[in-house]
């Protein structure tokens, strides 16, 4: 990413908004925005294989592994406004498990892009399934979207929930129910 070019574009944007980019409070804003965008879109410069393969451990277990309440934030691709919330990941290990921190890194990898929550959920699930060859993967993302809170319908307390269920999580109601119960989202 060319930070200097992005800073120049932000400077021009400020002018188009009627601001003076040379005034005291805005002098460094273009540089700061460019740095922030570089970080907030850093997911484009990584890949799941590199993240996960660093920490795969042989473990003969066929149990469900769950990481709950992984904090995440992303930028909505429609308005480039943040959405933020929590991601819950479960998988049924076959012969390998992944280091728990790699699950959080996988969430960050896909969240740090211009995103749709639906796509984010699917990308996390498919990456984990592909890399671990798990018997099943379940991912639930719950998020609040500033594009819905600050503009448009202006609904302050709305929460969007998306899920992706693959393999055993999709095929077995019992497995899916166990996962949703353990993450605290199953309601009879």
Where are the model-predicted features located?
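A domain-level signal for the structural core that forms small-molecule/cofactor-binding pockets
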Residues: 1-188
């Amino acid at each position: 990413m060319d930070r200097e070019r992005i800073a120049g574009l932000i400077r021009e944007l400020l002018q188009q908004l009627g601001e003076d980019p040379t005034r005291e409070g805005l002098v460094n804003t273009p540089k700061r925005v460019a740095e922030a965008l570089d970080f907030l879109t850093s997911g484009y410069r990584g890949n799941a294989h590199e993240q996960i393969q660093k920490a795969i451990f042989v473990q003969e277990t066929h149990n469900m592994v769950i990481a709950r309440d992984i904090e995440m934030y992303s930028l909505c691709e429609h308005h480039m406004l943040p959405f933020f919330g929590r991601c819950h990941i479960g998988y049924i290990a076959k012969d390998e498990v992944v280091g728990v921190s790699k699950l959080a890194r996988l969430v960050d990898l896909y969240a740090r892009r211009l995103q749709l929550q639906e796509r984010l959920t699917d990308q996390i699930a498919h990456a984990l399934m592909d890399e671990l060859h798990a018997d099943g993967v379940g991912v639930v993302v719950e998020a609040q979207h500033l594009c819905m809170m600050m503009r448009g319908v202006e609904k302050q307390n709305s929460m969007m929930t998306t899920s992706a269920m693959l393999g055993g999580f999709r095929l077995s109601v019992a497995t899916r129910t166990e996962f949703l119960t353990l993450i605290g989202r199953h309601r009879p």
